[in-house]
Amino acid sequence: MVKVENKETLRLLTSRFMKMNRARNIIAVIAIMLTSLLFTSLFVGSVSMILSKRATEIKQFMDSAHASAQNLSEEDAKRLQETIEQSEQVERYGSGIFLGAGMDERFGFSVEVRYADENMAESFNCLPTTGRLPEKENEVALSSMILENLGVRPKIGEEITLTWEVNPMLKQYKTDTFQICGFWQGDKAVLGQMVWVSEAYAKENCYPVTEEELENGIYNGGKEYSVWYKNLWNLEKKTETISKAAGFTKAGTGMEVNPAYNLLEEDSFSFSSLIVMILFVILAGYLIIYNI
């Protein structure tokens, strides 16, 4: 390529060229601008659609963590927690225990009684906006929708009596009176409404589920974990590595990636479709500019 030292001459030649083909050059500039605008709009629109779909799935399925493990026995939970804590890929994690379903005809929706630490409650998008999570054995934090349906004032210190299912196979139930220590605005669009109890209450009253019972569909007393990695790269590989290191070798066991973050799932936005659209825009822009 010839290097032109005289910039004034270059500007003069460019100016004359523009004046000689003014109409065509103006159309070419407009075509370039429109192509750039279309490309930018396509990219921004695609990213917005992906993020919007992700936010919707996170809200609907009540899971904002990158990966999670559910329905674990005491032994499996202990082994997995040790592995998570040793992993350099993990930024933070949350833990919880599923006690059972809330039982009351006045609910009209699904209610789950659980223990959750702050990270786990955050992954469910059910952190108290008023008050705090339970610390004492007789404390409870719950959705405002539950309080409304039971006719209890949403006020810290109010007492509430709840019945929950200890074991669905044995038809075993437990009823206790709690003191409200926190609550948040319930959302009708989510899968269920949460009731958080303290760790002390959960360990004292949860069903001692066995691994065999978990395999047969009894999840009461099952332990669970939510994990956030330091970044979103290779979520499948990171999750698989932790699961295998914790001793989970069977398919469907151990940790699983949150589908909301897996953009290659069948029901998620297809990257191949995005690439095809981008190539189409580039080709169309090139042909328009070339023909001018």
Feature names for model-found ranges:
Residues 10, 254-256, 269:
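Short, glycine/acidic-rich beta->alpha junctions
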Residues 3, 38, 136:
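Generic anion/oxyanion-binding catalytic loop in active/binding sites
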Residues 20-51, 266-292:
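Hydrophobic alpha-helical transmembrane segments of multi-pass inner-membrane transport and secretion
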Residues 47-265:
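Basic-flanked hydrophobic alpha-helices used for secretion and membrane insertion
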Residues 1-12:
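Short, membrane-interfacial amphipathic segments enriched in basic
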